[in-house]
């Protein structure tokens, strides 16, 4: 009997004095939770010897979140609306009246669904020329990485790209006439997909007009572009044609200057006694209609030496009478006759 009593006395101090193991688990499991969803932190102990006080902490520095006391192997702390800023490290501790024992750190990741992406064109903007290398850039302003992007022309997939660390992604292609129309992109990160708004690409000289079924086609912009290019050429041709006709009319026009007068010979008498010179007549070309014009010339008489001597002998008064007789009839100044008035 005594040996059994001694064995019992020695065995009692060898029993554990309290809890020895504390662990933290999450729901949903794995430490991943969607933004806006609920996160449950479950703290567990290996044994219960009475009331146990549970503590929940955030971060390595141990910002205390909650405290509960209950005689159970587990206790739960709930965060009802998780935000992206709630992503951090968490741990718990348990105390059964002795020294508290802490669990290991558990990392919590908050998954953020992608927001609606924005599609933009590169340096060319929404104006481009056939043959250009066009860059499509798609970016979701919010969303947990990695983000997967797909690029569309109308409903046809042009290509795809990914952003392992978040942010946006680009896709390049060489522009052809078949690429006229609407473009869009789609972003997803495993938590749902979002589609961007449709953006129309305008080729230089071509307008893109959406139709009822959403497919764009070439409009009258092509006609406007052609007219814009041909108008200066047409004006230049009209001007050259007008100038050519004007030069042709001038070359075919009747002579506007007075015709060269060919005097029909002088019949003036060489006698000193002849006072009155005989007029000369000349017909002028027909200028207008059936009218014929005549010019009458009076040429001063060239005096013979004897006549000149006669003038010097009889003085100035007689010379004046001779001059008066010679120029008694009006003379026609050919140089001032305007043939244009006759037309």
Curated annotation (Swiss-Prot):
A motif (ITIM motif 3) lies at residues 291-296. The chain crosses the membrane at residues 220-240. A motif (ITIM motif 2) lies at residues 279-284. It comes from the Eukaryota. A motif (ITIM motif 4) lies at residues 325-330. Disulfide bonds join 138-185. PROSITE patterns: IG_LIKE (PS50835). Keywords: Cell membrane, Disulfide bond, Glycoprotein, Immunoglobulin domain, Membrane, Phosphoprotein, Receptor, Repeat, Signal, Transmembrane, Transmembrane helix. Residues 258-269 have a biased composition (Polar residues). Widely expressed. Expressed in B-cells at the various stages of differentiation. Residues 17-109, 117-200 form the Ig-like C2-type domain. CDD domains: Ig. Gene3D superfamilies: Immunoglobulins (2.60.40.10). It is a single-pass type I membrane protein. Residues 1-16 form the signal peptide. May function as an activating coreceptor in B-cells. May function in B-cells activation and differentiation. Interacts with ABL1. Interacts with GRB2 and SOS1. Interacts with SHIP-1/INPP5D. This is Fc receptor-like protein 1. It comes from Mus musculus. The gene is Fcrl1.
